[in-house]
From Swiss-Prot:
Descriptive protein name: ATP synthase subunit b 1
Molecular function terms, GO-annotated: proton-transporting ATP synthase activity, rotational mechanism; proton-transporting ATPase activity, rotational mechanism
Record carries keyword Cell membrane: yes
Signal peptide extent: none
Length: 253
């Protein structure tokens, strides 16, 4: 088979034209599209990488924030526990202090009640002792002589300072003296009383006489505003007061 040169040349020209046409209408657009797709893929990859980095940064921030929050929570919890422990200790201390105060007040009140009861019992015991002694004395010495008691009263009057004796003399001059004895005095006893009173306070002193069995024995001189006593009732009363006072002083000591 013979090959014509012009045919070959025409075929070559056709091939070149086809290549040019394919290059212009197919290859270049395909390459351009590939480049665009490649660029878009690169952009997407870069954007994804940026997003991954941003996500990592956000995650790191979240981890840091979580760690900070946990640290703050631990600090707040520790502070709350410390405050709660301190407040609890303060409450315990206050409760102990209040309890001690209540106990102290209770002990004080109990001690005061006990002292009052003891004082009341001592007073009753002293009063009972004095009453018993008075009854025994009244039964043992009926009608005891008044002269020794009157002599002691006169001795006390004599021992008074002059201003006080003048005051008593003025009261006697104005209102007289009432002489009270445990039993009624006979005329001799009254005469003895008049003699002693007139000697001490003046001859013009008015005297009246009375009797009071509760004196047990002794005498009382009643002036207008003053009473001078020397009797067993007065003595027993002073003994009772001394007994009670002695018990109080002994208890306080």
């Amino acid at each position: 088979m013979a090959i014509d040169g012009w045919t070959v040349a025409l075929q070559a020209v056709n091939f070149l034209i086809l290549v040019l046409l394919l290059r212009h209408f197919l290859y270049r657009p395909v390459l351009a599209m590939i480049d665009r797709r490649k660029a878009e893929a690169t952009r997407l990859l870069d954007d994804a990488a940026l997003r991954v980095e941003a996500a990592k940064a956000e995650r790191q921030k979240a981890e840091t924030l979580r760690a900070d929050l946990e640290a703050q929570a631990d600090a707040l919890l520790a502070d709350s526990r410390a405050r709660a422990g301190k407040e609890l200790e303060e409450l315990r201390t206050r409760a102990r202090r209040e309890a001690d105060g209540i106990l102290a007040e209770g002990r004080k009140a109990l001690a005061e009640e006990r002292r009052a009861a003891e004082a009341d019992l001592r007073g009753k015991a002293a009063g009972l002792a004095v009453e018993i002694a008075g009854r025994l004395l009244a039964a043992a010495t009926p009608g005891a002589r008044v002269e020794p008691f009157l002599d002691r009263v006169c001795t006390r009057l004599t021992a008074l300072p002059e201003p006080e004796r003048q005051v008593l003399a003025g009261q006697a001059a104005d209102g007289g003296i009432r002489i009270v004895t445990a039993v009624p005095l006979d005329e001799a006893g009254r005469a003895h009383c008049r003699d002693r009173a007139h000697t001490l306070l003046g001859p013009d002193i008015a005297l009246t006489f009375a009797d009071d069995p509760e004196l047990l024995a002794g005498v009382e001189l009643h002036f207008a505003h003053t009473v001078i006593r020397d009797s067993w009732r007065d003595l027993l009363g002073r003994i009772g007061l001394e007994l009670d006072g002695h018990d109080d002083a002994h208890r306080i000591a």
